[in-house]
Amino acid sequence: MPSFDIVSEITLYEIRNAVENANRVLSTRYDFRGVEATIELNEKAETIKVTTESDFQLEQLIEILISSCVKRDIQHNSLDIPADSEHSGKLYSKEIKLKQGIETDMAKKIIKLIKDAKLKVQTQIQGEQVRVSGKSRDDLQATIQLVKNAELGQPFQFNNFRD
């Protein structure tokens, strides 16, 4: 019985490259000259800390980070950007979390989406991934297209294809 897994993974070396590119762009930007501004990656906690002197510059810094992520083929919705910023002394900061794995609520949304489409496949949650199996490859390909076209707020990859 053919099957595949739906996962949500980010390659950390691509994130590291995106953060380094954003820091390079930051060092050449005229509007950030003489301003204390940093973009730091914490790989163990899977977070990116963005710090600068004003709220407006913080938003500009996040735009720089998002554009460098997009250039590295990292979708911007894989970054969980908080709405409000932390303010301490003269610095504003945001701690951006990286979305890794599929949480149970999101997995249930994916399964409901597939069930509502009435495709002849079986789904099951396995930790931080969703296993989809069916009798026909065509049904599996239709499921992949359905999940790709759905706006669920998180990027998904499809791997572990088995025949």
Curated annotation (Swiss-Prot):
GO molecular function list: nucleotide binding
The GO cellular component terms are: cytosol
InterPro entries to which the protein is assigned, alphabetical: DUF520 (IPR007551), UPF0234-like_C (IPR035571), UPF0234_N (IPR035570), YajQ-like_sf (IPR036183)
Q: Which UniProt keywords apply?
A: Nucleotide-binding
Entry's SUPFAM superfamilies?
YajQ-like (SSF89963)
Q: What does this protein do?
A: Nucleotide-binding protein.
Q: Which NCBIfam families match?
A: PRK05412.1
What is the protein's given name? Answer: Nucleotide-binding protein HSM_1099
Q: What is the lineage of its organism?
A: Bacteria, Pseudomonadati, Pseudomonadota, Gammaproteobacteria, Pasteurellales
